Amino acid sequence: MPTLRSATLLDAPALLAIYAPYVEGTAISFEYEPPTLEDFRTRMEGVLAVYPWLVAEGEGEILGYAYAHPFIPRKAYEHCAEVTIYLRRDCRGKGVGRLLYTELERLLSAQDVRDLYACVGVPRVENDPYLTMTSPNFHAAMGYVQAGYFPNSGYKFDRWYDMVWLRKSIGGHDTPPAFRVYPDVAAGED
């Protein structure tokens, strides 16, 4: 069974090694080029200052990761977060993603995040060589529902891709307490 822990900047090379093939060979990421290691570390620093970034490990190796980041960087949206997950190809379909997302949701709930959003590419044709329905199906199995559909919004590999926003509510919508940054939650501060 994989174990989970918070990511550190020392994990950046292993995490980038998981992410880069998604950029280079799929339309799962709409980036055209993988970020440099320095840029990836900078992204991680920005996330870890506010949100959790989790890694799953098994037998001493990182199997995948999941993190949250601002849904929209405006004060009124602070109780919403966008979530992202990437797994090593050989770890998909083995419960690693479910484990990561379940813990990520628990931590985000402790931050008083109420709604989670995932931006997911959708193939326009069956048997697309660069994009499948794996991510939309995974998110549906995790309780996400479609909140928005944007046709022809991503162009990669000489073809157009649709994009959906998926939403999952993890908290009530009464007047929320103040948003808490992840380092405070992790330290057990109220």
What are these regions (language model features)?
Residues 85-90, 94, 122-124:
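Active-site acidic-Proline motif in GNAT/NAT acetyltransferases
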Residues 179-190:
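Short, cationic low-complexity segments
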Residues 67-70, 119-121, 127, 136, ...:
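Conserved catalytic-core motifs of GNAT/GCN5-like acyltransferases
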Residues 83, 116-118, 166:
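A structural signal for short, well-ordered beta-strand segments
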Residues 34-90, 101-102, 107, 111, ...:
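Acetyl-CoA-dependent GNAT
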Residues 108-134:
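Conserved GNAT acetyl-CoA-binding A-motif
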Residues 3-15:
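A short beta-loop-alpha structural element at the N-terminal edge
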Residues 16-43:
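Conserved GNAT-fold acetyl-CoA-binding loop/helix
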